[in-house]
Amino acid sequence: MKLNPTVSALVIAAGMTMPTVMFGAAADLDSCCTPADKDQPKVGANLANQSYSSLNQISKANLNALGAAWMTRVSPVPATTPGPSAGTTDTGQQTTPVVVDGVIYLDTPNGGVIAVDGATGVAKWKWTPTVANTGFAPTGTRRGVSVGDGKVFTLAGGQRVVALDKNTGAQVWVSQPTGPAGASLGNIAKVATVYYDGMIYLGGNDGNRNAAFAVRSSDGALVWSFYGGAAPGVVVTDVNGVTIDAGATWGPLQANGLSCALTAGVSPWIHPSVDPELGMVYYTFGNVRSCGSSQDGSGRPGDNLWGNSVVAFDLKTGAYKWHFQSIRHDHWDMDNVHPPVLADVNIGGQSKKALYYGSKSAMTFVLDRTNGKSLLGVVEKARPLDSRQQSATTQKFPAQGMWFPECVVWEPLGTGNIPGSPWRGVPNYDGYQPNAVGQLVYTEPNYLDVDKPFVTYPAEYGSTHRLGCMYDDHWDLPVLSTTSQNGGPDWSNHGFSPRTNLYYVPYGINNVAHDRTEGGNGLRPIGQYQTGGVVAINASTNQVVWRNHFGLDVAHGQHPLITSSDLLFIGMPDGNFIAMDAVDGKELWRFQTGASISSGAVTYAIGGQQFVAILAAGTGIPYGNSITEGDLLWAFKLGGNFKTASGSSELPTPAPLALRRPVGNTAASALVPPNTVLLARSNGTATATADSTATGAMVPSTLTVPVGTTVTFLNPGPTTFATNPNLKAHCATQFFEGLFNPKLNPGESFQYTFTRAGEYFYNDCTDPRPTGKVVVVGVPQDLPGALQFVPGILSMRPANGVHTNVQGLATAMLKVPVGYTFDGNVQLKTPLSTTLFPAVTATMTSDGATLIATFDKALIDNNMPEGAAVPLVVTANFMNAGVQKQLSSTANVRVVK
């Protein structure tokens, strides 16, 4: 575990005093904005979705004493209800735990529910439905239960809502709610449930038509419902007296006489917020995907209500109150569904009942939650329009702007700028091609020239070609823009602290290329980095106060938890659970849980002691199969001293994440010569599609070679494929290092010798989608006996007795043969992890004979066991005779913990 040294010094000076934890809130919250306390009975902590707790025992002053109290693997726990059954080995879940009266409730990886004693980690009960014992199965992905009225509310297979006795897990009732005349309410499977005052508020996800709806907590009977796609004849009047013909916003009826609204999706797939004082519940509705696709708006002219809108309803009746649409006529699949955050804040010297409506488009609309009007101003911006898309002429932006750049950053290529701006664009998209010095310059002709007759540019856009900006229009060919359907905060909760008056947003960055032929999420260019962080926004001004861009995407369920001691806890896709200073965003504390985290933390108090808990279970978005799934429920407290099998409190570091979008899997064939790549072919056969624009149209997609290999890039002409040659010129534009950029006519080839290990992506200039990768590997040259650690005994004992506070450096010395020049990349391999750990410092002695490297004990202690002869391997790159070599040596070291 890594602790900020300044904080450590403060704590040591303060000693181990343990302040009394303050609490008092009941499980059934009675107001929107009362902070959660010893209980957090719903995802988002309170009815306002603030993800904030008034608990303050764990603070910046004693953070170095925060250690693991216990860890429970929830899947192997046997089920107790509705009938005894064995545990499972399932992993992976997006749920955030909730807690009431010291008991943690959460969805298990296989979709059941478990109750765990918050003090000990011992399971109290576990509910796992099966077709054999209940007549239905669980759902898979779940995002949270809620607790109230003595029950735990969850979802199950077959569009079921289930109530369980919170003390025993016994089924109280099961319902299958339907809409008017038995109509489907959508796919009832993922959305976290919200309980308030005898009602459960729910939403449909992923179906053709989805509704927000409420059922009674006593028996699951439907009380009201409201569909996201407004059918013909739906006319409403809001609290401001404005009448809207919502059904008319979908254009004319189809040839079959039906409205596009009836198959539009428009899912309320994230849990709502509730204001009991105003008697309103606030839902957000997502993207439109009917009459074409989510990337094609040509068949549904109009604003398409209630797509990408926040809508306020009467709590009891579901009567429409007001709405605010963030994106008109969405054909980018921006899917602005986020839990609305409510707060009472001072704006312009007056107390306002605010609603914060954030978005994947990286902007926050600050609204008056009594009437839906903007509190800080909205501007309408004209965007480039493709006449075929039936686009809205303007789109809404907060007057304060976005918290991301509005356009893609077209940074120059070069080895000195890796990885570069988080918002940098992959070359060749939108016509931005590298010039002779690697600058990305808009160049004609390019693949988007065919759109010119249909695209118009408003004067305020400042260009007559696409810049890669928010809401740039598209048609059949990919147009790269920011942000992304998988960027912004995606489904992560936001947070709010009344102490700091900051609104917190965990985000991801993943530029996306839109065209009508892409799937729902568009095309995230292969090879671009997938990163993210947390941004804090002044709740009174909507201005960014700080940003911590820590390089990992936290847009996918990694909800922040803020406490009244001004700490912000958040889980990471690499398994780390971190604490940040909520005032300035600095990281203060870090713990390795052993599995990817796609969940929010929860805090609670038992017997006057504060705990923080997190589920490390994992999800594949956006890092795919490189993530490590799990089923690990962790709890932390001051003085926690839980230890794993290695003798450390942390689990070993999971396998490294694939931070760049992966290439396809097109393999070579017998017709492809060794160390050769064929450009723009669907595969390596003579009958392949020539001049292919598929993403996998570099053959092979991945070519792995040793350092020093010369690779040939060939645009196959008649000599290679006599009856089916490529007819167009094609490029191999290497990015982001900019090592080469040949443009080859059919039959031409280019060679490049790779002298250093690494991953080298490249794509085509004729159409930017075909992308490949050359993986250059160093062949380790073993140096027996050349490595030693100083001193010979490696102590991993923490100074304060709490094992999460291991600090200091481990020093290694590697003897180097004559004629080798140091070339960097010093790494340590440990027995318990496949991750290689970088050196903190690495220097050569003045005679060039010895490499001295140091490694952070906080990163490596959990990745090695105790023992008298623990094998540790150091590798480093050196140049010899103009070729990079990887030297490696092993030392058996005594490790004590």
Language model features: what each stretch is:
Residues D37-G44, T88-G112, F136-V161, L185-A212, ...:
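Repeat-blade elements of multi-bladed beta-propeller folds
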Residues V602-L657:
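Blade-level signature of beta-propeller repeat domains, shared across WD40, Kelch, NHL, RCC1
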Residues T72-V98, K126-S146, Q171-V194, S225-H271, ...:
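Extracytoplasmic beta-rich repeat domains
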Residues D117-T120, D165-T168, R216-D219, L315-T317, ...:
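Short loop/turn segments that connect beta-strands within beta-propeller blades
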Residues L659-P780:
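Extracytoplasmic copper-binding redox domains, predominantly the cupredoxin/blue-copper superfamily
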Residues F23-P35, L659, G664-S682, V779-A810, ...:
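Boundary/junction segments of secreted and surface-exposed precursor proteins
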Residues Y507-N511, I526-K586:
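Loop/turn-rich, solvent-exposed surfaces of beta-rich toroidal or solenoidal domains
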